[in-house]
Every structure is written in C-alpha cells, then in structure tokens.
C-alpha cells in the first residue's frame, strides 16, 4: 500500500480532503 494511495482512500472514506 502506497502512502499516496492510503491518503486517497482515507479521503474517499472520510470525505475529508
């Protein structure tokens, strides 16, 4: 899991970008 991918996933799930 890449850090950038993890950040993108977190953004999608929490709706906090």
UniProtKB/Swiss-Prot annotation:
Disulfide bonds join 11-17. Its main location: secreted. Signal peptide: none annotated. Expressed by the skin glands. Keywords: Amphibian defense peptide, Antibiotic, Antimicrobial, Disulfide bond, Secreted. GO terms for biological process: defense response to bacterium. It is found in: Secreted. It comes from the Eukaryota. One of its GO terms (cellular component) is extracellular region. Belongs to the frog skin active peptide (FSAP) family. Brevinin subfamily. Antimicrobial peptide. This is Brevinin-1AVa.
């Amino acid at each position: 899991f890449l850090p950038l991918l993890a950040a993108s996933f977190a953004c999608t799930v929490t709706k906090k970008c």
